[in-house]
Amino acid sequence: MFFSLLLMLGLTEAEKIKICLQKQVNSSFSLHNGFGGNLYATEEKRMFELVKPKAGASVLNQSTWIGFGDSRTDQSNSAFPRSLMSAKTADKFRSLSGGSLMLSMFGPPGKVDYLYQGCGKHKVFYEGVNWSPHAAIDCYRKNWTDIKLNFQKSIYELASQSHCMSLVNALDKTIPLQVTKGVAKNCNNSFLKNPALYTQEVKPLEQICGEENLAFFTLPTQFGTYECKLHLVASCYFIYDSKEVYNKRGCGNYFQVIYDSSGKVVGGLDNRVSPYTGNSGDTPTMQCDMLQLKPGRYSVRSSPRFLLMPERSYCFDMKEKGPVTAVQSIWGKGRKSDYAVDQACLSTPGCMLIQKQKPYIGEADDHHGDQEMRELLSGLDYEARCISQSGWVNETSPFTEEYLLPPKFGRCPLAAKEESIPKIPDGLLIPTSGTDTTVTKPKSRIFGIDDLIIGLLFVAIVEAGIGGYLLGSRKESGGGVTKESAEKGFEKIGNDIQILRSSTNIAIEKLNDRISHDEQAIRDLTLEIENARSEALLGELGIIRALLVGNISIGLQESLWELASEITNRAGDLAVEVSPGCWIIDNNICDQSCQNFIFKFNETAPVPTIPPLDTKIDLQSDPFYWGSSLGLAITAANLMAALVISGIAICRTK
């Protein structure tokens, strides 16, 4: 893939000819300047192309993610074969048809109760639709959407800080003797599994208003094999319009309060000190607040008549931060949905929402097998280099045309304009340099360019500036910076980029913890920071480009030196090197076959250190490049590949 050209120049003495290694440059070449050497090239290309994120969900590592779902990810469901994802992806989900995390938390009568649990750095949630307005769950509340919103938000928040999570479906408890398990007409003559309803008989006509309820529950440090550092607990209580609505018999105010082991109030409602704020008439409503509690023993105190007892929780190990993806979970036509999942994710730092642009149109049935959702989830079959609210990227380029919206994780590209990305020479390359490069053998080569520039993420301007990359002194002959200087420059850039990449990723993770989608000021600040990083990276790439050009030029000159040395060795006394890369041969002493041996290697073998591609040799004259200026024309499919002799010609002048 590389070619060299030899030029023969005629001398005035008829029996002698002058043959030189020579550049062949015309107006189609462009000049590229570098640190330590320059290049002529027939083509040029950008160091990186802009990439465009793909819409939908993906993961950074196939072995470290887990999903939580329902019938749309349940392979045992009859509608699954025409559902939304591959069987391979569905295997990663903990799912049961008809289930949802909230259904398992509260356990309304007649609904699916599934033990959700699992571990993974990245958690994908595609569930929630089974608790929606279509489910028509009442139990002292006509609309559970705001509770669902707070529940899902708490789940996403804690999941983003944990490696493992699990439903704890049976808390240890102690209840007072005077209460019994209760039911409610508007709960199908039953009640929720969590909280459980306990009732106490009250006889005010006999001046017996009942006793205050005192109960205890324990949040475990471990549930099965799952460690519990923090629990999500639903603190539920009734809301009454007034004291008279709660207790028309004059037996005191309503209260339902949770205390920790030190006696501190952690949740509940106390109408002994707080006003009544209900608006439901004679029927109370039930409110459930989401509490994040550490393992331990807690007490519940309530007024007579009713006790709402926490009997379930979700436990989290809080061991590892990681991405959370929430997939919009809505019904197809004919069923009413809510958008609690969407709102919960958008208001939770670190949560990426996968959202449809069109109504859900199922293919297996009205509610399973939507084509748009299938496309949005197809990325779960692959590993991405970057995942973000804008989509996922698996290309190696560090630049994208548009700013990727946070949150984002992985090796994410920065926004840049195409015209700002530096260009490098390509196609046929010819080095130019000072006149001393073929008489002084270079000490060493420079390697590692591809490793250095492929996969760059974020870099910033370092304190040393550009000058910090040009260590060492210039050669007195004017041939550019020394090779040792260039090597140190590459090493410094590599080290700086690795350090800055690490520190920048840490900074981005901290920003993910702070950013929510409605915090415009933080979003604007993040955008400014990323724009600065993009400009810094482009500046670094400009330096790398200049060093790269110089490195290629030096490398080609070294190969040229090897070629010249081999020719001189083969010629022995038959050719006299009169200047770097030029020899005089007596045509009467060294005939055509002799010249073929010296310059064409008998058309059988190239220079031993240079792998062959084309060993044909032709000689041609180009008097414009007479003298000691040296070069080697190459094709640059691989910038650091070895050279091959090709295209040497002899021109005689008597």
Curated annotation (Swiss-Prot):
Protein's GO biological process: endocytosis involved in viral entry into host cell; fusion of virus membrane with host endosome membrane; fusion of virus membrane with host plasma membrane; viral budding from plasma membrane; virion attachment to host cell
Residue ranges, annotated region (N-acetyl-9-O-acetylneuraminic acid binding): 157-309
Keywords: Disulfide bond, Fusion of virus membrane with host endosomal membrane, Fusion of virus membrane with host membrane, Glycoprotein, Hemagglutinin, Host cell membrane, Host membrane, Host-virus interaction, Hydrolase, Membrane, Signal, Transmembrane, Transmembrane helix, Viral attachment to host cell, Viral envelope protein, Viral penetration into host cytoplasm, Virion, Virus endocytosis by host, Virus entry into host cell
EC number per UniProt: 3.1.1.53
Processing after translation: In natural infection, inactive HEF is matured into HEF1 and HEF2 outside the cell by one or more trypsin-like, arginine-specific endoprotease.
Glycosylation-annotated residues: N26, N61, N143, N188, N394, N551, N602
Catalytic activity from the UniProt record: N-acetyl-9-O-acetylneuraminate + H2O = N-acetylneuraminate + acetate + H(+); N-acetyl-4-O-acetylneuraminate + H2O = N-acetylneuraminate + acetate + H(+)
Active site location: S71, D365, H368
Main location: virion
UniProt region (Esterase domain-2), positions on chain: 309-363
Topological region Extracellular: 15-629
Location relative to the cell: Virion membrane; Host cell membrane
Region (Esterase domain-1): 41-157
Membrane topology summary: Single-pass type I membrane protein
Transmembrane feature ranges: 630-650
Family listed: Belongs to the influenza viruses hemagglutinin family.
Protein name: Hemagglutinin-esterase-fusion glycoprotein
Lineage start: Viruses, Riboviria, Orthornavirae, Negarnaviricota, Polyploviricotina
UniProt gene name: HE
